[in-house]
């Protein structure tokens, strides 16, 4: 008689996705980041659920309700620190995941990769609205600056901003709707993740050498389930250590002050994981141009399948493009540094050069190097 997990209508789906799934035998630790993202999403939904039980989405009490969670709620400080730092780890895993996808040519599974880019945009949106909720100085001014970018939309911009704010400035209506969005978005992300996985399981995973691995597959469980478990333990160890020993390390000290519309912080900047995009936004003097560059810095990932010119899928045997890939990583690191710096002389020009290089690598150098390597192969 067949096992229940292979016959039951619901268990069968889980079995085909997590237990009997045929997986390539040679995928490395870089393929762990997907399941780590799943773990991060679960951590964020659970900690967020418990935080929402004690939080009040009102401008007069939001800041003090967060203080109340940390002081008076049983283990509230731990839940809050796990949630705040969990967001940082979510983005660390996302950037590893995207980097893996670029390096090993995973983007050639177009449907999976397109859903992945939509997921990235959703997660960025969620992180932004979540950062506004504690109603500290940087929450308020970050919300004001970023929502104001919509005013760059021709003709309807100003109406759009006021419609989003629910008034003439970031105020109680804005905070309330952002709390509603923050409750809704993670469940949309969870649904999109399912679609992401459905598309992935249509084709199967890539592997480090970029060849078809149908000839040699191994079951996901026990091999990769245990490999993923190692990743889970490592992630949780680092996350809990950070939440216990240095919970404010990645945050902005300005956010420890309650929001004050009359006092502008000296340097308005987002959380560290948005700094590269913020630097690209700031490097263009024109408002609409900056907003478009900001959008395109993420949407350029959608063009990767079109810009893939090489006969080889992965970068494992492509030294030229490998160099460009690591140049891109270094460039994003420079942009992240510039995004946190004040807008003054050396930083402005460095940011503009780094932004130009970012788009040049994606749109010009990657395709050119691919064609050159094809010539070298023939």
Curated annotation (Swiss-Prot):
It is found in: Mitochondrion inner membrane. Keywords: Electron transport, Heme, Iron, Membrane, Metal-binding, Mitochondrion, Mitochondrion inner membrane, Respiratory chain, Transmembrane, Transmembrane helix, Transport, Ubiquinone. Its main location: mitochondrion. GO terms for biological process: mitochondrial electron transport, ubiquinol to cytochrome c. The chain crosses the membrane at residues 33-53, 77-98, 113-133, 178-198, 226-246, 288-308, 320-340, 347-367. Binds 2 heme b groups non-covalently. InterPro entries: Cyt_b/b6_C, Cyt_b/b6_C_sf, Cyt_b/b6_N, Cytb/b6-like_sf, Cytochrome_b, Cytochrome_b_C_euk/bac, Cytochrome_b_N_euk/bac, Di-haem_cyt_TM. The cytochrome bc1 complex contains 3 respiratory subunits (MT-CYB, CYC1 and UQCRFS1), 2 core proteins (UQCRC1 and UQCRC2) and probably 6 low-molecular weight proteins. Component of the ubiquinol-cytochrome c reductase complex (complex III or cytochrome b-c1 complex) that is part of the mitochondrial respiratory chain. The b-c1 complex mediates electron transfer from ubiquinol to cytochrome c. Contributes to the generation of a proton gradient across the mitochondrial membrane that is then used for ATP synthesis. This is Cytochrome b. It comes from Nannacara anomala (Goldeneye cichlid).
